[in-house]
Amino acid sequence: VQNILMKNLTDVCVGTISWWAFGWMFAYGPIEGLTKFAGNTEYFGHGFMTETSVGVIVPTDKPRDWFFQWAFCSAAATIVSGGIAERVNFPGYFFYTLWMTCIIYPVVVAWTWSGNGWLQGGTEQNINDVGYVDFAGSGIVHMCGGVGALVGAAVVGARTGRWDPEREGEFDPHSLPLIVLGTFILWFGWDG
């Protein structure tokens, strides 16, 4: 349990800094130049404030959007922690989180959600046009996290010393009250 909790905390802490520094830029920054690979401006929060004609600096809506999208980014990174639980050391997981929240997830978002990406062509109204349609992150968030967990589990292999081939059975949960509390928190978060 401590291993997974520490990895989830790492996802949030490292993910916040890397999403702020470069992730947002790759995902939602304006794409300048000939490529539609990923955004290449607005790193380190540039573009979150703007100057008016009278020289007053005022906030834009981007910090709100940044926070909302950061939550999706952290969720995608956290999905992997269950797939490689108790098998990856902390420095290895730290660099995975940095890579996922700074490069992998933002580039996938740039291709699909940003409005500038090469997969952004189809909409629900125009289904014959080739493009990507996603509902609430089902493809982007969960696919990035799921593929990351699959690759991670394949690379690190099975847990040693945890499985007994002679005795098959289910593991008892660590704390049933915490499982129920977590379920209620998820329900509350989903319902608003």
Show where each model-derived region lies.
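Hydrophobic alpha-helical transmembrane bundles of multi-pass membrane proteins
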Residues: V1-G192
